[in-house]
């Protein structure tokens, strides 16, 4: 059975685990570097990117996760995970993995009280819109030449792919729609 690691330090990791199970794969909660070994893909959940970055450093996960993605294994970051995957973060020196050639702006849609849901058109997932749950969501402000823009909302880039790396500003794990998780799991050889 396909094992998918889910960084389980803070944030919506349980919801991602349920989504991975619903897609027929086995979720593995990652809290230590050795737990990555058998995983064929990794999800970095939403939560608070600064806190997750500090916890990754404290648990010696930064380099193993960076290596995991640099070796070409699939990594999917949602919300805070998008921020952590970015090469650059506007007005911030916070810890990041720097795996994707993107620049992001944190909290681009406002504060917690400004959280919202919207229908998002994601052509690679078909004609039916995706329900996007935005909670203090980032957005991408610049992409490198190897980055494909998969979706935007209000002219802000919210879903990108670079090879086997996927980053989204919203929380697909908080909905019953598994299309984005299935799309990501198809990255696995």
UniProtKB/Swiss-Prot annotation:
Active site: 79, 171, 173
EC number: 4.3.3.6, 3.5.1.2
Positions contributing to L-glutamine binding: 47-49, 106, 135-136
Keywords for the protein's UniProt record, in alphabetical order: Glutamine amidotransferase, Hydrolase, Lyase, Pyridoxal phosphate
GO CC terms: cytosol; glutaminase complex
Highest taxon in the source lineage: Bacteria
Function comment: Catalyzes the hydrolysis of glutamine to glutamate and ammonia as part of the biosynthesis of pyridoxal 5'-phosphate. The resulting ammonia molecule is channeled to the active site of PdxS.
PANTHER family: PYRIDOXAL 5'-PHOSPHATE SYNTHASE SUBUNIT SNO, PYRIDOXAL 5'-PHOSPHATE SYNTHASE SUBUNIT SNO1-RELATED
Protein name from the UniProt record: Pyridoxal 5'-phosphate synthase subunit PdxT
UniProt lineage: Bacteria, Bacillati, Bacillota, Clostridia, Thermoanaerobacterales
């Amino acid at each position: 059975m396909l094992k998918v690691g889910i960084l389980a330090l803070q944030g919506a990791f349980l919801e991602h685990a349920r989504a991975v199970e619903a897609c027929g794969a086995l979720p593995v909660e990652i809290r230590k570097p050795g737990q990555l070994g058998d995983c064929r893909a990794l999800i970095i959940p939403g939560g608070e990117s600064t806190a997750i970055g500090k916890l990754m450093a404290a648990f010696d996960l930064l380099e193993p996760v960076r290596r995991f993605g640099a070796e070409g294994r699939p990594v999917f970051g949602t919300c805070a995970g998008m921020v952590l995957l970015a090469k650059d973060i506007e007005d911030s020196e916070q810890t990041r993995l720097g795996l994707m050639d993107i620049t992001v702006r944190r909290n681009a849609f406002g504060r917690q009280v400004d959280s919202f849901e919207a229908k998002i058109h994601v052509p690679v997932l078909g004609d039916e819109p995706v329900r996007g749950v935005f909670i203090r969501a980032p957005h991408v402000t610049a992409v490198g030449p190897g980055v494909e823009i998969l979706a935007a909302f209000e002219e802000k880039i919210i879903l990108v792919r670079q090879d086997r790396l996927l980053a989204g500003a919203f929380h697909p794990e908080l909905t019953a729609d598994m299309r984005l998780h299935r799309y990501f799991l198809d990255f696995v050889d």
